[in-house]
Amino acid sequence: VTLFSDATRQTVEAMRTGGVRRLVCVTGIGAGDSRGHGTFFHEQILMRFGLKSTYADKDRQEQMLWGSGLDWTIVRPGYLTNGPKTGRCRVLTKLDGVRAKKISRGDVGEFLVKIVGDEKSNRQTLLVDGG
């Protein structure tokens, strides 16, 4: 699987060419140093049997952003649901002792829109869940 890293490589190149600096990117719980902070099902079943190569590619995607020189923010949602927006969004940068919880796709979308113009989130990797 190279979908995420290929798309990120092309996006970063296009941004450099166009002089665009800001990128907010969604990867997922289990990418990079968030591995081990998901639910039991995510960590023991999905990551072992179904998503191993996908998350290896998400790791490559994140590494590209870290070295891109862009003003990036990586957002790693917890377990995504199709439920309604709740308005609850816990944002974490430190994961010690944390297990990600559920969050609706609507709440993630609302959070993404909110941080696009937030310079404090530049070069931050954030775990978001419903708390």
Where are these regions (language model features)?
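SDR active-site strand-loop-helix element
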Residues: L23-I29, V75-P77
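Conserved catalytic-site region of short-chain dehydrogenase/reductase
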Residues: I29-R35, L80-G83
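Mid/C-terminal beta-alpha module of Rossmann-like enzyme folds, strongest
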Residues: G18-R21, K94-G131
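NAD(P)-cofactor binding segment of oxidoreductase domains
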Residues: V1-L23, R60
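Glycine/proline-rich active-site loop of Rossmann-fold NAD(P)-dependent oxidoreductases
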Residues: D33, P84-C89, I115-Q124
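Conserved beta-loop-beta element that borders a ligand/cofactor-binding pocket
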Residues: E62-P84
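Alpha-helical membrane-targeting segments
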Residues: H37-S53, G97-R99
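NAD(P)-dependent short-chain dehydrogenase/reductase
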Residues: Y79-L95
